[in-house]
Design a protein with these regions (language model features):
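NAD(P)H-binding glycine-rich loop region in Rossmannoid oxidoreductase-like domains
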Residues: 2-48, 52, 74
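Conserved Rossmann-fold NAD(P)-dependent oxidoreductase catalytic core, especially the SDR/UDP-sugar
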Residues: 48-93, 112
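Conserved beta-loop-beta element that borders a ligand/cofactor-binding pocket
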Residues: 100-125
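Glycine/proline-rich active-site loop of Rossmann-fold NAD(P)-dependent oxidoreductases
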Residues: 121-134, 168-182, 205-209
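A conserved pocket-lining segment of Rossmann-fold NAD(P)-dependent short-chain dehydrogenase/reductase
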Residues: 135-156, 176-179
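Substrate-binding strand-loop-helix patch
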Residues: 153-159, 181-202, 216-221
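Terminal hydrophobic/aromatic helix or amphipathic segment near a protein terminus
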Residues: 175, 196-250
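Amphipathic terminal alpha-helices
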Residues: 250-297
Length: 297
């Protein structure tokens, strides 16, 4: 165990010796804000390590690599008309990460990227990503209803992510993809209002609270306010908030066949995974649990 970025090349070679597959499940995502330009931080933590690790993996005789990416990259490729890479530095970085990784693929080195959506479930000692959602929802508790985008999202559980990694590592037919493959990942597709019913139930408020879908322009207006606050603080987010409105309004669903058929992922209880994630997020928000959050360094 240790920080791979602190290891010398020789130490990494020793760690990789005798291994069949290299899995990159590190880096940072869009939740972490940095000083402008934020893209530089994403390159440092998500791309530069691969520029170093993948050549070492090939040198050590490793035959496969699995990289944990984002389903925003899937959306950017499916909907080039949305110009997501020009709006959102984080999405641009994920596309660049995929392209860099695929440049190392050959007949002796299969490269796969899991384009992961939202993940539910808990990890011992780790702060859930959903604490920020609790902060947002609590601001609306005083209202008779909750205002939220109309769309929905792909999702899966923590355990299913692990199974997808194993499935990608053991997949034997990468040759037909030119030894490189981006896997769109989803085990469940859920509308935001259905998701929020589970969230409110986990918060102890029942599952009957009314959720009102907001139009894109209203979400975008709220996003502009957030961007102005960030600018005053000298920070930049990887996702441009006004542009997020269109994404949140759409049903960002993915065919589950890639997980269940190709990668041999098994069914899980997504309702319980969401419930547990929110319960722990509430505890973290209220200071009842000491947890480690995501950080760059």
């Amino acid at each position: 165990m240790g920080n791979i970025n602190d290891k010398s090349d020789d130490e990494i070679r020793q760690m990789m010796g005798g291994c069949d597959c290299f899995v990159f499940a590190a880096g940072v995502d869009e939740r972490i804000e940095f000083p402008k330009p934020v893209y530089d931080a994403y390159h440092k933590f998500n791309i530069a390590p691969l520029e170093r690790m993948l050549p070492l993996a090939k040198e050590c005789g490793i035959k496969k690599t699995v990289i944990l990416g984002s389903y925003f990259a899937y959306l950017a490729k499916e909907r080039p008309d949305m110009n997501l890479t020009s709006q959102h530095p984080y999405i641009r970085s994920r596309i660049d990460q995929e392209n860099l990784a695929f440049s190392y693929a050959d007949e002796n080195f299969d490269v796969s990227v899991l384009e992961l959506p939202y993940i539910f479930g808990t990890q011992p000692g780790r702060k859930p990503v959903w604490v920020i959602l609790i902060e947002q929802l609590k601001m609306m508790d005083k209202f008779p209803c909750t205002f939220y985008p109309k769309g929905g999202t792909a999702m899966l559980t923590v355990r299913q992510v692990a199974e997808a990694i194993v499935g990608a590592a053991e997949y034997e037919d990468y040759a037909k993809f030119g030894h490189k493959k981006a896997w769109p990942i989803s085990c469940y597709n859920m509308k935001w209002d259905e998701f929020l019913r589970i969230v409110y139930d986990a918060r102890g408020m029942g599952s009957k609270r009314k959720v009102v879908g907001v139009p894109i322009w209203m979400f975008a207006m709220f996003g502009k306010k957030i961007e102005k606050e960030r600018e005053l603080e000298g920070i930049e987010s990887g996702i441009y908030t006004p542009g997020l409105a269109e994404i949140m309004d759409m049903n960002l669903f993915i065919d589950t066949k890639y997980c269940f058929k190709d990668l041999k992922v098994t069914q899980d209880d997504i309702h319980s995974a969401i419930f547990d994630s929110i319960k722990l997020s509430v505890d973290a928000f209220e200071g009842k649990a000491k947890l480690i959050g995501m950080k760059g360094e």
